[in-house]
Regions:
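N-terminal cleavable signal peptides for secretion/export
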Residues: 17-63, 68-71, 78-94
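Sec-dependent signal peptide recognition
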Residues: 2-9
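Solvent-exposed helix/loop surface patches that form functional interfaces
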Residues: 85, 89-152
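Hydrophobic h-region of N-terminal signal peptides that target proteins for export
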Residues: 10-18
Length: 152
């Protein structure tokens, strides 16, 4: 019986990290011949999203990374890079968020809600099958608060 308890405890400790490791590459092609590539990766403790959009004579790369908990991704860094130069960024600490266009300088606000960029929000929804009831979205340039209404 003691061996069974030890094996069961080991299995329970292993399962949450075993199912959580994912590495997806997605290619999107439109009628406008502008391919986009998105790479989603999560290993149980960290996640990253890297999106590349190839517009003729103009390349855009969105990157996001952060930690991973049992119920949500926690973004710590987001960058919008255009033609190899940083355009907009968001930096998240436990108590503040800095964001803005690089050329205009960054604004700092208290961090009051979970924060996602659009790609991390999509990854959160597909990976965990839910979003927090209130959160905020950033594109690096600004922040928009979101409140979800739940049906009763």
């Amino acid at each position: 019986m003691k061996l069974f308890k030890i094996l069961f405890a080991a299995l329970i400790a292993y399962v949450p990290t075993a199912w959580s490791a994912v590495d997806y590459n997605i290619k999107y092609s439109s009628n406008y011949l502008m391919p986009a590539y998105v790479h989603f990766k999560a290993d149980g403790s960290q996640y990253s999203v890297n999106a590349k959009i190839n517009i003729p004579l103009y390349n855009i790369v969105f990157t996001s990374r952060g930690s991973q908990t049992a119920s949500q991704f926690k973004m710590v860094n987001y960058q919008d890079v255009r033609n190899g130069k940083p355009y907009a960024i968001s930096k998240i600490s436990p108590t503040t968020i800095e964001y803005g266009k690089v050329k205009n300088g960054l604004e700092t606000e208290p961090l009051t809600l979970p924060t996602f960029d659009l790609f991390t929000m999509a990854f959160q929804l597909s990976y965990y099958d839910k979003l927090p009831t209130s959160f905020q979205i950033t594109n690096g340039k600004k922040i928009q608060k979101v409140l979800l209404y739940q049906a009763r």
